[in-house]
């Protein structure tokens, strides 16, 4: 199976969520199941069934996080070679050539992508157009509304 790229920061966030689920959430669910079981008949015990359902979700998320971390290629962005090219993990400041609108994106793996945090997947059309380019280069991105032209204003290696 191919390794999925993940920044060190993204891997740390997944580890923290996994730790929280294992040490805080899972024990609470087990306690809720035990309390509901003590109420008697399990066939008509809504609290018991709700707690069991929550347990299924928690265990599924734990398995999912463990799988993601086991199959991740963790990349420390601070140790990347700073040769002026756009690579995985960098933050790129763009200027729309037609509208002068500015945007800033960090190129991350699929697991970390979150447009609200300006993190775009390395597999997105914008990131694919940016990889290997340098500051001052122009790129074309195919958007639903047509082709958009951007200039790379800055590249940051945080």
Curated annotation (Swiss-Prot):
Gene Ontology terms: biological process: DNA-templated transcription elongation; regulation of DNA-templated transcription elongation
Taxonomic superkingdom: Bacteria
Chain segments annotated as coiled-coil in the UniProt record: 1-26
Physiological role: Necessary for efficient RNA polymerase transcription elongation past template-encoded arresting sites. The arresting sites in DNA have the property of trapping a certain fraction of elongating RNA polymerases that pass through, resulting in locked ternary complexes. Cleavage of the nascent transcript by cleavage factors such as GreA or GreB allows the resumption of elongation from the new 3'terminus. GreA releases sequences of 2 to 3 nucleotides.
Keywords: Coiled coil, DNA-binding, Transcription, Transcription regulation
Protein name: Transcription elongation factor GreA
SUPFAM superfamilies from the UniProt entry: FKBP-like (SSF54534), GreA transcript cleavage protein, N-terminal domain (SSF46557)
Lineage per the UniProt record: Bacteria, Pseudomonadati, Pseudomonadota, Gammaproteobacteria, Chromatiales
InterPro entries membership: GreA/GreB_C_sf, TF_GreA/GreB_CS, Tscrpt_elong_fac_GreA, Tscrpt_elong_fac_GreA/B, Tscrpt_elong_fac_GreA/B_C, Tscrpt_elong_fac_GreA/B_fam, Tscrpt_elong_fac_GreA/B_N, Tscrpt_elong_fac_GreA/B_N_sf
Protein family according to the UniProt entry: Belongs to the GreA/GreB family.
